[in-house]
Amino acid sequence: MSDTVPLAERIPVVPAGCLPVSAPEARALLASVNVVYTDLDGTLLAPGGRLLADHAGAPSTATAEALVALKSAGITVVPVTGRGADQGSEFLRLMNLDCYIGEVGGYILRREAGGRIDERYVIGDWARMRLEPGLAPGELPAGLNPWEFIGRSGVTQRLFAAFPEMLFAYPTPRSVSWSFWGNIDVERAARELLAREEFPLQLFDNGILYHPPGTLPGDAPVHIYHLLPAGVSKKLAIATDRASRALPADAALAIGDSAVDLEMSEESGVFVMMANGLRNPEVQEAVAARLAAGQKILHSTRPTTDGWVEMADALLAAR
């Protein structure tokens, strides 16, 4: 298919050996799952970040009903998202969940028995570094969170200068990661800018934005990017959460729509790739590579929230 066709209009291409999550042959992989680690946008939520809608935008309670059915069956759902720490408490309250992993794995919020709230930053490679003289390894300067520490370094302004009119920060303050929209060469940014920074940082492309906050010169497609301490990832956050639950990998399922989400497959017994993710050639290649390496990857046959409900139904049927 021509590269000029927008991703949202492309037909999903399923790599050989990737079974539908609803296939009878997949039931054995799903039978032991007790925790679902799920991306939100493009996965659990309908386009536009909606819960009470289907993929086409029509009013629907199907996803809410699936969440209730999973909880009633004793299956825990944990959002693992690029959204900010500030949204965690609301997600836990509104969706009746006990854990939220935000900022691409940099923030974990837990609601413990009795209502006690526990939150922590996951700072990756920084945990072994002295961020200022006189501080212990991994200790942040007083009054600063990782997002503020990164901002204070000036790296965001250097990125804007390197990619004028092609990179913009979301205005909402965060806790760990910086979030941007635009269209830039991530490898060039890492090579020419981030490699020179005093503290190790990583910048990655989290895919196309189907509802971008603005437009770019030449109508370039708008991507979302995250800048965060090196070593931070959804994979590391899931490993941290699994350890706290004493949860074996084969009791965990992860689901998402991007190549970044595929990292979660390394900490779960099975991964489900969304049908909308399989419109992207980069995702198709990444899925094929992980299948060739022996990882267990399934796919939904329907996009976004409709595919998430498909996964939930298959999971319940396998019990």
Each model region followed by its residue ranges:
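The start of beta-strands in P-loop NTPase/AAA+ ATPase cores
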Residues: N34-V36, D98, A252
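Conserved acidic, metal-coordinating active-site core of Asp-based
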Residues: G151-L253, S258-E267
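Asp-based phosphoryl-transfer active-site loop
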Residues: L29-A53, P79, S265
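Active-site phosphate-binding/coordination module
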Residues: P47, A58-A169
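Glycine-rich phosphate-binding "P-loop"
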Residues: L44-G57, V222-P229
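Charged, glycine/proline-rich intrinsically disordered loops and linkers
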Residues: G114-I150, D205-H223, P281-Q295
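Proline-centered loop/turn at the N-terminus of a beta-strand
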Residues: G74-T76, C99, Q202, A251, ...
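Mg2+-dependent phosphoryl-transfer enzymes with acidic/Ser/Thr/Gly-rich catalytic loops
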Residues: P6-P20, A26, A31, S60, ...
